[in-house]
Amino acid sequence: MTSSELSNVAMRFVATRRSGEVSALFSRPSDPRCVLVFAHGAGAGMQHPFMEAMVGQLANQGIATFRYQFPYMEQGSRRPDPRPILLATVHSAVATAAGVTDGLPLFAGGKSMGGRMTSMAAADSPLPDVRGLVFCGFPLHPAGRPATERGDHLLDVTIPMLFLQGTRDKLADLELIRPLCSRLGGRATLHVADGADHSFHVLKRSGRTDGEVLEELAREVSGWAVLS
């Protein structure tokens, strides 16, 4: 899909009373089937090249996206907000998206930290009208420190979850992700991108491009959303 076929509407909404307004982008293909509320990762905002590329691939699959900034990123800081602010921002973003998406089926998630914060928000209190969660590289543990505690709250999430994980992701050992998904039962779907790292970058010797990996991920989101 070309940029001319994708409608991008810049918006602002109140993240929290304390933090004030943040920016958002509603990107809508000509005939969307659903909407993904899509949060950025810890180190880069909603217009990072990964976010832009993934939005384009999702649009090719008929999926509109509602991207937004967390307050710290809006303010130009590199240090993430305290967790209560991050979680409140997720709830505010979902509520705002629900008001502008014309009743389309709604999903939520994000890249790395954005997906994790979305899942924590859903575990604390259901996200109204959200049918499922999408994680682009769920950060299960710090690099080099395999652990599973960051996934414990997922047991309290009651809606379907799609995990998109790379085999070279140093923040999510597949030997830990797989049993976690098994514990979650039918709520969890795991798709593994062969050769991809945490940024879904693949080495040249893999024989494919980063763009092809993102296309693969978008197809998975599309097929999963139909069933959720």
Language-model regions: role of each:
Residues 90-159:
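Primarily recognizes the serine-hydrolase "nucleophile elbow" in alpha/beta-hydrolase
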Residues 38-42, 112, 166:
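Glycine-rich His-Gly loop
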Residues 204-228:
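Catalytic active-site module of serine/aspartate enzymes centered on a nucleophile-bearing elbow/loop
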Residues 170-176:
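Conserved alpha/beta-hydrolase "acid-adjacent" motif
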Residues 13-106, 200-210:
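Serine-hydrolase catalytic machinery in alpha/beta-hydrolase-like enzymes
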Residues 183-201:
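Catalytic histidine neighborhood in serine/cysteine hydrolases
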Residues 156-158, 163-165, 169:
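Short beta-strand/loop motif that positions the catalytic acidic residue
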